Design a protein with these regions (language model features):
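Catalytic core of Fe(II)/2-oxoglutarate
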Residues: 216-284
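Non-heme Fe(II) oxygenase catalytic core, chiefly the N-lobe of the double-stranded beta-helix
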Residues: 9-216, 220-230
Length: 284
């Protein structure tokens, strides 16, 4: 993107409504970052990552008209027919096909494979990934996949056909929807991929009982441009680009995080949301 075009976008962003809030970025560490998804052996910390709050400006996305391949995210209005998101069968048999059709239509891709989902229900003081506790909003800046783990996810899920698929463009896109609106508690903030530098991303091990995944923690950069959707409703979804194999200037990684909105009133309903993760194959 040319400097003139970028400058025009910067001016337009500064004209948008915005708030200031604290986002948690990873602190510098000489060690390889590791986080366990289960209770680790005695004496081993659940995570060795340290996060530091930084005040940032977060713009109202609704007037920004972001594009998935430019900023790395998009806000789309689309209702769902699913009424009960505690029903796993409804999620897999109804919601998955709805989201697949929505992604195909929005991206123009040839094939979409939705491979998992997470329902989050915030509980005050709860720690994420604790046994018996619903998954909690992730209050730290991160990206779900890395240069290494993106292709590896395709190999793990699709086996023998993976290598031929990896010869063409593919992406990993999250589909994020609130289950109750308007969202005032722990809304999602997303970062313009074009405002992040490669050095901002820190590869981190995510340790499961049967495998080790890799995600990106993110270091603070004052140039990051953040966006959120005020009072997001259950009829809206975020598309978040977590990986893209294209290296032609297309948005590849869009950091994101939940955050505490300082303007939110007291005693608001706790956030409930669902996110799907999808492999998106473009056939080119």
């Amino acid at each position: 993107m040319g400097d003139d075009q970028m400058s025009a976008r910067e001016i337009r962003y500064r004209e948008l409504a915005s708030i200031e809030a604290s986002l948690n970025y990873v602190a510098a560490s000489p060690e390889r970052l590791k986080t366990y998804t289960f209770d680790p052996p005695a004496g081993t910390p659940r995570s060795n990552a340290v996060f530091e709050p930084h005040r940032v400006r977060i713009f109202d996305v609704r007037a920004a008209a972001p594009e998935l391949d430019r900023e790395g995210f998009a806000l789309v209005k689309k209702a769902t027919s699913v009424q009960d998101f505690s029903d796993e069968d409804a999620i897999r048999n109804v919601y998955y096909p709805e989201a697949e059709a929505l992604l195909l239509d929005h991206t123009g891709a040839e094939r979409v494979v939705i491979f998992d989902h997470t329902v989050r229900r915030r509980l005050a003081g709860a720690i994420d990934r604790t046994s018996g506790v619903p998954r909690q909003p992730a209050l730290r800046v991160h990206n779900d996949y890395t240069e290494k783990s993106g292709p590896q996810r395709v190999r793990t899920l699709l086996g023998a056909e993976a290598e031929s698929l990896l010869q063409k463009r593919f992406a990993i896109i999250n589909v994020w929807r609130p289950l109750q609106g308007p969202v005032r508690d722990a809304p999602l903030a997303v970062c313009d991929a074009g405002s992040a530098n490669p050095d901002d991303f820190v590869a981190s091990d995510l340790i499961y009982r049967d495998r080790v995944g890799e995600t990106y923690a993110v270091k603070y950069n004052p140039n990051h441009r953040w966006f959120y959707a005020p009072d997001m409703t259950e009829d809206e979804v975020w598309f978040l680009k977590c990986y893209d194999s294209n290296r032609d200037g297309t948005a590849r990684f869009a950091p994101h995080t939940a955050f505490d909105d300082p303007a939110a009133p007291l005693n608001i309903p706790p956030r409930e949301s669902i996110e799907l993760r999808a492999l998106v194959f473009y056939g080119q």
